[in-house]
Amino acid sequence: MRFSKEYTLSDLGICDSLIDLYKAADKKDLTYAGRVGGGSVMPEVKKSRDFFIEDAGPLGEPSDYKFDLYQEQLNGFIDSYLQSLTIHNQEFVMQRLPQIQYYKPGDGFYTWHVDASGSDGCDRAFVYITYLNDVPNGGTEFFYQEYTVEAKKGKTVIFPAGLTHKHRGVISEEHEKY
């Protein structure tokens, strides 16, 4: 059984709106250098510019950028994922709102890693990644599963955060990735 599952947003316009939100945040200097576990900036490990949705205050309401529609679909994906693993009546709490990560061509999360513990100190059971644009030769590679998720606009992948799902970014030398 594969413990990663892929889903697709029904409205791909959500992706465009979230990219617009990121760009607006970047213009207001609300983005920051991507961090790795422990909150360290280590560009030799991960090179990106990141933005937490919860910091969107100066940009208007997140719903202005279809974040509410994204959150609704994401919650449905998570429910479906948990049911597929026959994990019922479990309460999982999202500790923080999602972040948008931007990678220039050649940038990415270069090293194998797991996401069980975040830089904010929260313990994670599951990870989700939603690709906001198509990235040929981009995506996420899973070490033990010998499996690569393609970065397709609107695709969400959910997987366990622990050691069983060590992964890294597939670096595109030609394309940006959100």
Mark where each language-model region is:
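Non-heme Fe(II)/2-oxoglutarate
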Residues: 1-92
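Catalytic core of non-heme Fe(II) oxygenases with the double-stranded beta-helix
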Residues: 65-178
